Curated annotation (Swiss-Prot):
It comes from Nitrosomonas europaea (strain ATCC 19718 / CIP 103999 / KCTC 2705 / NBRC 14298). One of its GO terms (cellular component) is small ribosomal subunit. GO terms for biological process: ribosomal small subunit biogenesis; translation. The keyword Ribosomal protein applies. Residues 98-159 form the S4 RNA-binding domain. The keyword Mitochondrion does not apply. One of its GO terms (molecular function) is rRNA binding. CDD domains: S4. Keywords: Ribonucleoprotein, Ribosomal protein, RNA-binding, rRNA-binding. One of the primary rRNA binding proteins, it binds directly to 16S rRNA where it nucleates assembly of the body of the 30S subunit. With S5 and S12 plays an important role in translational accuracy. Belongs to the universal ribosomal protein uS4 family. This is Small ribosomal subunit protein uS4A. Part of the 30S ribosomal subunit. Contacts protein S5. The interaction surface between S4 and S5 is involved in control of translational fidelity. The gene is rpsD1.
Length: 208
């Protein structure tokens, strides 16, 4: 399967902000963007005025990188959001946030979305008591996500849980760290999500 193999820290520098792709490193002073907050490459420090199209494209790339999707995957999510009732941009973010790998990450079962995706693929996650190994599966309100019994002793999962305890869990989730399980209480409202994302630029880009 195709995947983005670009170094994660370079991806953050390319977008000019932390995308939280490397787990705990993103919360430490070791994060490269703290020292080099400019795009990578020979001419990275040059200031360039972007066209409207370039701004829209950069925002789409940023959101894709945050959620770890390839272009075709992201476009398919957008098409689904566009067909739903309501505001397309809000629908888009709700669909992205409802992915099983993203929910597992937000519950603290993986230190990053990419690690959470691996955990899902390796049959370490149960959804409503049944094995679930498709990262793109959309979780519904009321669904119960938990770590499979055989995976509860994995060191990387334990480390992720300890790190998650030091951070706040999104309000639309409820997590039992002792039993490694969590409840997807409701779909997040736009006001609950990151204000650094401008999904309207993606809508403008794909509407052309």
């Amino acid at each position: 399967m195709a995947r983005n193999i670009n170094p994660k820290c370079r991806q953050c520098r390319r977008e000019g902000e932390k995308l939280f792709l490397k787990g705990d490193k993103c919360f430490s002073d070791k994060c490269p963007i703290e020292r080099r907050n400019y795009p990578p490459g020979q001419h990275g420090q040059k200031k360039v005025r972007l066209s409207d199209y370039a701004v829209q494209l950069r925002e789409k790339q940023k959101i894709r990188r945050i959620y770890g999707l390839l272009e075709n995957q992201f476009r398919n999510v957008y098409k689904r959001a566009d067909k739903q009732k309501g505001v397309t941009g809000d629908n888009l973010l709700q669909l992205l946030e409802s992915r099983l790998d993203n929910v597992a990450y937000n519950m603290g079962f993986g230190s990053s979305r990419s690690e959470a995706r691996q955990i899902v693929r390796h049959n370490c996650v149960l959804l409503n008591g049944k094995r679930a190994n498709i990262p793109s599966h959309l979780v519904e309100p009321g669904d119960l996500i938990e770590i499979a019994e055989h995976a509860k002793s994995y060191l990387r999962i334990k480390a992720s849980i300890e790190a998650a305890k030091r951070r706040s869990i999104p309000s639309w989730l409820e997590v039992d760290f002792d039993n490694l399980k969590g409840l997807y209480k409701s779909k997040p409202e736009r006001s609950d999500l990151s204000s650094t994302i401008n999904e309207s630029l993606v809508v403008e880009l794909y509407s052309k």
